[in-house]
Amino acid sequence: GLAEPPNVMRYQAPDINPNGKPGKYDWHMDVGPGPVPSMRKISYSILLNPTEYEGGELCFHIGRNTDPHGDQHMESMLGSMLLFPSYMVHRVLPMTKGTRYAIVGWAHGSSFS
């Protein structure tokens, strides 16, 4: 089920970000320790404004951790929903122009063994 409410994520380019840094999200997994993150099975991301920014691509790490070319960039259209296993390592690349909005959330199930 959907035990957590979805989140609206905002990433901004450095010229409009109050801290002057590009919005990004470093490599991570959505599943983790604790009662709520351990229940995450499927992660989703819905892109809300793909023509209004540059940079900010959602990337997935494929292959060994030492592989410098092991990430795959995902291109999305307005309103497209991307589903992936919550244990998959992913990131959002730094923004270069504009603001990126996405709705993200997780479907839950029994803990992984």
Language-model segments: residues:
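Catalytic core of non-heme Fe(II) oxygenases with the double-stranded beta-helix
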Residues: 1-113
